[in-house]
Amino acid sequence: MGMLVKSWEEGFMKFQPGVHFEYDMYGTASAMGALYTGKGDIAILGQEIYPFEVKAFEQERHYPPTEIQLATGSVDVRNFDYALGPFVNADNPLQKLSLDQLDKVFAYHDDPKDNILTWDQLGLTGPEWEGKPIHLYGWYESDIFSTWIERAAMHGSHRWRCGMKQYAHIHRPDGSIYDSGQQILDDLSHDRYGMGLSNVRYLKGTNTRPLLLARQPNGPYYAATKETLINRQYPLTRVIPAEIDRAPGQPVDPAVREFLLYLLSRDGQQEIVRNGKYLPIQPEAAAREREKLQ
């Protein structure tokens, strides 16, 4: 994120050479605090804002922050909000899921009718699938990936299914990291009755494949690709926002407004493409975000 922000600054200064930037890149966790305490003008986040961050801002300022979407999460670039999704063993015939089914598979619900526990409940037939339990693979419940899935697919619930095998990064003695997403797909490779949450960057060398995903029960279904992420068709698309402090009925600070308009311009979005990590947003989406700054 730091390199992208620096390139945005340099690009903006070509049009506004007198502008001066001061920034502290301590990470997403500190950005909102700097905004609502008046230490910063713009909080550019590396992930979607958390509800507790909105609440903290509201407690201090008595109104919510204004969000401007700047970029789209990556397909498979580590640490750049890559697209999450469900995976199965390559020997499993299941091809697709809806978000509602994903919720019913991974989340626990009080009503038994809202829990999907076996493969026949997902439409698989035959003695090798009927009545066979779905084995779940995912991150620890406190992981930021789990937290985001709770918001995006589980209606904010924190109640994961009991028995899910949970993973965290493993730090090896040589300094390398065995990513949790890789561990999930490695273990799923040996379990034809398993379903896991991960990312396509970890597919190579495993006996697994991703499922198509739909927002609605009857589709349309999508894989996570650059096109489907930029177009917001893939249901678990990640969004990279900037948050600003704009009091109700008041204009955006002129300097903040001009900088954000630059980020949403063709030149600003092209910097995202050149950076090669995050993805840009659609021109139509950029136009909608610019409207928020009026």
What residues fall within each predicted segment?
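Flexible loop/hinge segments at secondary-structure junctions
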Residues: 1-294
